Regions:
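Class I S-adenosyl-L-methionine
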Residues: 2-323, 355
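PRPP-dependent phosphoribosyltransferase catalytic core
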Residues: 353-389
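Conserved SAM-binding loop of SAM-dependent methyltransferases across substrates and taxa
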Residues: 333-343
Length: 389
């Protein structure tokens, strides 16, 4: 289905109208051979910066994974205090981390242009995750259908971001945002994503405890559908399966299960099979499209995202040495995840504070591969950023 979002100010010749910009090397971190790949942290407006990156054959069409957490069109300033980080601060004494002041069609066009460039940078087997909120997400979904094709829409992931808030409003409380997952083509990298149960989940799913202290639950020994002529439709120990159902196992298997102590008999003589938690958890649990990765309690940057969540995305949609791009790098969580999982990376942001925080986080890692800080702003590096180098 062909879709298009129509709004005022929509540019029909995006690629032709975006200027490129020179990237000047500011500082190298770590040492390696000159002709080896260096990860890139770039200060500047991501639009002309990405246009410049398109001129490099080792980047254009080579990015395996894009994750972006763009501004949400909140019409607010996000600030950082000296002793704390605030998601939204009204104090003029705090340093501005970034401004999220674009709204309406202006915001949509801002994001659309960047999505078009990101598609150009993506490899044919690459994919993109766009993290957005519930207010703008549905408009962005239509934009992405237009750019990437509705046939390449993979998932709308719900992310539980916080605990329920106890305040009154005319409507339901909001504890989630969304991640739109698209591929560039049908042939995209997918390694699957699996999860393990928490202790609380196991206690809820396996509420019973046997004499040896093992947690278990029970399930019916019969299944839907009658089997009148087969062995699973016959009486076992004088008991017929309920009407319209059959035994899950033939009588000889039921006898074996009972000898092994894997059948629990109720006071009324109803048999049920025991399922033990310690055996069940050995199975891989396929991750679904509702995630609970809450924001860090003490973020180093406003809107900082959960590192475990980014690792899930990086592991599922890229392989070692693949190139990962985040053009709204923020606190650098995508880059940290890529670095720790052995991927190459490019991070771009126009906030001096974002670059500062990302640098500190990267250099705090026990091991970090060589990377280069570039200035792609077209202006001298801000003094606040010069002071931390």
């Amino acid at each position: 289905m062909d879709v298009e979002l129509v709004y005022k100010g929509k540019d029909k010749e995006v690629l032709a109208n975006i200027p490129s910009i020179s990237l000047s090397e500011v500082k190298r971190f770590g040492s390696s051979l000159l002709d080896e790949w260096h990860n890139m942290l770039i200060f500047g407006d991501n639009l002309p910066v990405m246009k410049t990156l398109m001129s490099r054959s080792d980047i254009k069409g080579q990015v395996r994974l894009v994750y972006i957490d763009p501004p949400f069109s909140t019409n607010q300033e996000f600030r950082v205090g000296v002793s704390r980080t605030s998601t939204v601060s009204s104090s003029r004494e705090d340093q501005t981390a970034y401004q999220d002041l674009l709204v309406g069609s202006e915001y949509l066009e801002f994001l659309r242009k960047r999505l078009i460039l990101l598609k150009e940078l993506l490899a044919d087997d690459g994919s993109i995750y766009v993290h957005i909120d519930w207010k703008m997400g549905h408009y962005v979904k239509v934009l992405m259908d237009e750019i990437f094709g509705q046939e390449h829409f993979i998932n709308d992931i719900t992310r539980i971001k916080c605990n329920p808030k106890n305040f009154k409003r005319k409507g339901y409380g909001n504890i989630k945002d969304m991640i739109l997952f698209y591929s560039k083509t049908d042939n995209f990298v997918w390694n699957g994503s699996y999860m393990s149960y928490t202790k609380q989940q196991l206690e809820r799913l396996f509420p019973k405890v046997d004499k040896d202290g093992r947690r278990y639950t029970t399930t019916p020994l019969h299944a839907p559908g009658e089997t009148k002529n087969g062995p699973t439709g016959q009486p076992w120990r004088g008991i017929l399966p309920p009407k319209g159902r059959h035994w899950r196992y033939p009588p000889e298997v039921l006898e074996q299960l009972d000898k092994q102590g894997l059948i629990e008999w109720s006071k009324t003589g109803n048999p049920r099979k025991k399922i033990y938690a310690d055996e069940y958890v050995k199975k891989k649990i396929y991750r679904q499209d509702i995630w609970e990765f809450k924001d860090p309690q003490y973020p180093s940057y406003p809107t900082e995202k959960n590192l475990k969540m980014l690792k899930v995305i990086v592991e599922a949609s890229s392989n070692k040495e693949d190139l990962v791009l985040d053009c709204f790098a923020g606190s650098g969580t995508t880059l940290i995840a890529a670095e720790q999982l052995g991927r190459r990376w490019i991070g771009i942001d126009n906030s001096p504070k974002a670059i500062e925080v990302t640098l500190k986080r990267l250099l705090a890692l026990k091991k970090v591969r060589p990377f280069i800080l570039y200035n792609g702003s077209g202006e001298p590096l801000p003094k606040t950023l010069q002071e931390v180098l």
